[in-house]
Design a protein with these regions (language model features):
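Short acidic-hydrophobic, aromatic-tinged amphipathic segments that line or gate anion-handling sites
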Residues: 85-101
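AAA+/P-loop NTPase substrate/partner-engagement loops
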Residues: 57-78, 83
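Conserved P-loop NTPase motor cores
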Residues: 33-53, 67-69, 96-184
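Pre-Walker A adenine-sensing motif
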Residues: 7-27, 48-51
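Pre-Walker A (Motif I) flank of P-loop NTPase domains
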Residues: 27-33
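Short, conserved catalytic or adaptor-binding loops enriched in Gly and charged residues
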Residues: 81-87, 182-184
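Intrinsically disordered, low-structural-confidence terminal and linker regions
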Residues: 1-2
Length: 184
C-alpha cells in the first residue's frame, strides 16, 4: 500500500503578517487584543504601550473610539501622535462615541485599499482600531445591525479585520463587586 504524504503545503497568497520588533510575546500584525479589568488597574497604560511603544510606527492609521479621549490626560501622548498622523479636520481619527456608519466606512475603505495593494503586488498598510470604555453605550455591544451583510460592523471587524490588515483593541472596565456582594 502506498503511503500518502501528510505534510502541509503552504500555497502562495498566505496571509501577510508583520512581526513586532519586540518579538515574543508580542504577536505579529494584524492582531487583536481584548482586555477587561476594574477601573484604575492600568488598562490605558497598556493601551499606550501597545500603540506607542511595541508597535510604534507600524500603523498607517490608528482610530480610537473612546468617550474620554479628549478628557483623560493619560491620552495626551496618543492624541499627539494621531494629530500628527493626518489633518483631523479632513480625516478624524478620534471619536467620543462609536458610530457604526463611521466604523463601516473605515473598514470598507481599508478593504478597498488592501484589494488595490494586492492587485499591484504591494504590501497593504496595517491600521488599528481602538475601542475603549464603550460598555456604558448599550447599543454598541448589543447591536446586530450596520454591517455590510446585515450584521454589526463590530462583528465584521472581529471576524474579518485581519484579512484587511486591521488590528483592533477592545478595552472595557470590569465591574467591581461591592463589599456587600463579596460578603455573600
Amino acid at each position: 500500500m502506498e503511503r500518502k504524504d501528510r505534510s502541509i503545503h503552504v500555497y502562495d497568497g498566505a496571509a501577510e503578517t508583520f512581526p513586532c520588533p519586540y518579538g515574543e510575546p508580542m504577536p505579529d500584525l494584524p492582531t487583536n487584543w481584548l482586555l477587561s479589568a476594574p477601573s484604575g488597574q492600568g488598562k490605558t497604560q497598556i493601551l499606550l504601550n501597545i500603540a506607542l511603544k511595541f508597535y510604534k510606527g507600524m500603523f498607517a492609521r490608528i482610530w480610537i473610539f473612546c468617550p474620554s479621549i479628549f478628557l483623560d490626560p493619560q491620552y495626551k501622548p496618543l492624541r499627539d501622535v494621531l494629530e500628527k498622523m493626518c489633518d483631523q479636520t479632513k480625516e478624524p481619527l478620534m471619536f467620543e462615541e462609536l458610530d457604526q456608519g463611521v466604523l463601516g466606512k473605515i473598514l470598507d475603505d481599508q478593504r478597498k485599499i488592501v484589494e488595490e495593494c494586492r492587485k499591484r503586488k504591494m504590501k497593504a498598510p496595517n491600521v488599528c482600531i481602538i475601542l475603549d470604555d464603550l460598555g456604558d453605550q448599550g447599543d454598541v455591544l448589543a447591536s446586530r445591525r450596520g454591517g455590510k451583510s446585515g450584521g454589526s460592523w463590530l462583528t465584521t471587524l472581529a471576524c474579518r479585520g485581519r484579512h484587511m490588515q486591521v488590528s483592533w483593541i477592545l478595552f472595557g472596565a470590569e465591574a467591581q463587586p461591592s463589599r456587600s456582594d463579596s460578603e455573600g
